[in-house]
Each structure stands twice: as C-alpha cells, then as structure tokens.
Amino acid sequence: MKIILQYITLFAVVLCCFAACQNDEKESSRHMSKEKLIELNTILVRMDSMYITMYSDTMNLNSHPTPSGLWLTIHDEGNGDLIETGQTVDIAFKISNLKGKTYYTSETEGSRQIVVGKGDIEDGLNETLQMLRPHARATAILIPDKAFGLLGDNNKIRGRQILRYDIEILDVK
C-alpha cells in the first residue's frame, strides 16, 4: 500500500507541474487560469477518493461515499431516533490521519459537547452526527473540504488533510 501511495503522490506532483507549466496564453507564469484551477481541484478530489477507497478496503471498513463526499461506517447502530439539528451531543472521539497519526482524542481532550447544526464544527462531523442515533459507534472519513479545508486547524492538523473520525455517541439532549 505504501508503494501505491508513493506512486499516487508522484503522479499528482507531475500532473500539477504539467498543469502549471502549460501556458497557451501570454499571461504571467504566476497566474493559473480559473479553468486550470478547476482541473487541478478535480484531479485532487479524484486522488482523495482513490486514496480513501484503498484505505477503506485495506482497513475492512466497507465505507462508501455519501453524495457530499463523506465516507461512513456504522459499527453499532445505537438506539432511538436519529440525532437532529439543535440537539446537544456528547461524544467520545479520536481524530487521526489515514496513516494512523492521532491528532486529538477524548482520552486527552475530554469528551466533546456539540450543538448539532451550529457552524462551529467541521461540516463532515455535523453531517455524520445527523446520520447516527444515541449510543452509536461509527468511523467517518472526511475529505479535506468536509474537515479543515486548505488551511488545517492552525494547530496540529495541516491543510488538505483527509481525516478519520472514530466516534461514540455518549449522550444526546
């Protein structure tokens, strides 16, 4: 798997260089056209999807993407109704990258209380919570724009990072 990831990374770098070096118009070499940026983003999204697919298969997660790009595996369905916007959820969690580096965990940070639907959490986490029931356990894989985007969290998580969230719903109010 490590070799495959190295080839994918090499392919992406070569493709980015190729896209950046082609200049049909007599514009400054520092400017990329909107079309080239869209093309580059499309390539990055495809590569993210391939990487997540390989990871999911390797880890036997049996995850599949939602239309928004969230990958979810529910390990324990929990009980009761689905969590709704406005409810306060207490979760145990572990946030890591797909290589296994742990960034945050409830063991060191304490459980996390979240008001579902509020804008102060990652979009992918908010979406995940609304697909779960009280006392559920799940693994969500968030593509960069569903997690911390291009900039990261300005602390431990770098930009454009695919993240794995292992979540257990402790309480819902």
Where on the chain are the PLM-derived regions?
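Cross-family detector of peptidyl-prolyl cis-trans isomerase
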Residues: I3-Q6, C21-K173
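Sec-dependent signal peptide hydrophobic core
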Residues: L5-V13
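C-terminal motif of bacterial Sec signal peptides marking the signal peptidase cleavage site
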Residues: C16-A20
